[in-house]
Amino acid sequence: MEYQYPLDYDWSNEEMVTIVKFYEAIEKAYEKGIVREELMGLYRRFKEIVPSKAEEKKIDKEFQEVSGYSIYRAIQKAKEIEEEKLVKM
C-alpha cells in the first residue's frame, strides 16, 4: 500500500517488524482473507507489544485513517468465526 504505518519509535526493530506483519495481516483480511489462527497469533503478539487498550485504540484509529481498515472489526470477526476458517471482511 502507499501509506505509512503508525509506529512507535520506542519499539525495538523486532517489535516494529512484528507490528508491520500484524498490519499486513489486517490488510489481508480485508483484501483476500486470512486464516483465523494466523491472524489471532499475530494479534496475540501485537498485544504483547501493545498491552494497553487505550494505546491499541489509538493505533487502530491511526491505522484506519491511513488504510481505511479497522483492526477492531477484523479481530471481532475473527473471534466470532470457527477455527480453521477464513477471516474475510
From Swiss-Prot:
It holds the Pfam family UPF0223. Belongs to the UPF0223 family. This is UPF0223 protein BCAH187_A4080. It comes from Bacillus cereus (strain AH187).
